[in-house]
Structure formats: structure tokens, C-alpha cells
Amino acid sequence: RAFENSQTIYTPAVHPREPYITQREMFVSPFYEREKELGGHFENEVAGWERALAYISNREKLDKYIKEVPVRENEWDTRHVPYDVANAEHLAMSDSVGMINLSHFPIMDIKGPDAERMLEYLSVAKVGGNTPEGKVIYTNFLDEDGGVHADLTISRISNDSYRVVTGGADGNRDWVTLRNYRDDNGLNADINIRTHDIATLGLWGPKAVEALGNFINPNEIDIENFPFVSAKNLTLNLSGLSLIHISEPTRLAS
């Protein structure tokens, strides 16, 4: 990897999406083999995780959406990603429902007497105090100068327990921020990295609730029992399922 990175500095300019050749398939999700069967386009990875940017099996969606897909006139602008298929996938998801593998999103469970104090200091939004259990808070971490350091969601699991979900490439940086603040201030809080223990899928689109209702009790996920920015635990085929209602009408399942 060091050699590959050096080529982007000491040789002529390379494409910003030029894929790495070395150290591939370091981390893959439980859905990886199925994604490959669907023609997943895995040229690029994120923080060591293989991530499909589109699925060739969805090329047929271009029949419906081709007129809405932007034309990229330069070859350089179409390299390494099948943008036409990816655009059609997004348009189809906006009309109906789509599922995105987000297993590369870092997950950290934070628990302890000082968990609230630590997250309250680092977060812009209020995550402690009278914030109810099961509430999901979208927030930023700020640096000492007030600049945005991280963009993430925090779920309050119990009085002294939280789950932090951050961006795909930002997990180590945000973990270091949390660890350093805890250790520098002598706080009592356990930071448990769960990324490799939990598979995560995002369900997006106006028919997301309808689709999910085919597998679990629809009453469990209606707007009254599962409001916006809330989290709850359910069971799907005897497997534990952690649901987050993060946007409307979206469901995030881990």
C-alpha cells in the first residue's frame, strides 16, 4: 500500500478513484458472495472494506431511467464506476425501495458512568440529560476551535449506554478522539468496537416500511410505534435485529 500511495505523488497524476491492487478483501460483509453473484462492482474499497458501488444485474433499470441519467461526456469521468447503473439504482430506490450494504460503517458501543459526560462534551447535539432511551441523535463532534471533526449518529441505549455509528472511512479517527478524551480526563467509559460483529443494511425509499413489513410485524414499525429518529430491538428469523429509523421513510437494520 505504501508503494501504491507513493505512485500518486511521484508519478504523473492518477485518477482519484484509481483502485488499490494490494491488500484487497481485508474485510468483507456476510453478503459479499451474494453481492458478487449480482455483479457487484468492487473496484474500490473503504478503510479495507470491500464495497460495491453498483450492481451490473441492475443494468436493466436503465430501460426505465435512461432519460434521467446524466450523460458523462469524458471517458475520464466514467472510469472505475458504472455511473449509469448507479444512477438508475438511485432513481429506482427513490420511486420504490432499495437496500444498501452499510456493513463498513464503524459501530462503537460506549458504556459506563462517564459515557454521558464524554459524549455530551464532544457532541453538538444533546445526547444525555433527559434524552430518552431509544432516541437516535444525528450530531457532529467539534474540535477545540469549534470546527467540525466528525459527522455521526448516537443512539441512547440505556442511562449509561450509547451506540455510535460513524462514516465508513472515519472509524479509527473517531475512536481515537473518544479514547484520547476519555484517557486524558480519567473518565470511566468502555469503548467497544462492534463493526466486525454486526452486519448493517440500509433500507431506503417510499416503500421501505412496506418491504420490511413482509418480514416482521408491520405494527412494530408503524409511525406510532417506531417514530422518526428512534431505535428498537426486534427479532427476524430468530436473529437479533437492531432497527434505527434514521430518515423518512428509511429503516437501518443491524
Residue ranges of model-derived segments:
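Glycine/proline-enriched, intrinsically flexible loops and inter-domain linkers
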Residues: 1-243, 247, 251
